[in-house]
Amino acid sequence: PYAGVNSAAANIVNVPLAAGSNGEAFREAIENHWLPRLEAFAPQLILISAGFDAHQADDMASLNLVDADFAWVTRCVCEQAEESAEGRIVSTLEGGYELRALARSVEAHIKAFLG
């Protein structure tokens, strides 16, 4: 759950991205902030709430991610699930409002999820 940018909760990692950020900034934030905390936590089950409104074609989040960025982060999470959770991972789909970009992003996510 969202608990604010400055949350001190141990189970929340908020890494705000500036409007207009692209996949490079997204990947850097994931690699430097989010994945180390996920690895340290070593979950026994991973739940993904996959939203795609950060796609560059979607005007909802003002970010510039592309399909490949969603596939990449999905692979990262799946790797962690293999390491700590015996592959136990569940994904649910959420937002994304530009339908063509949503379809491509969901396809990239599912392909990465299935390996």
Placement of each model-derived feature along the sequence:
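Conserved alpha-helical scaffold segments that buttress catalytic/binding sites
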Residues: 1-76, 110-111
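Short, electropositive alpha-helical surface patch
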Residues: 66-67, 99-115
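A short helix->loop->beta-strand "cap" motif at the edges of active sites that frequently abuts
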Residues: 81-88
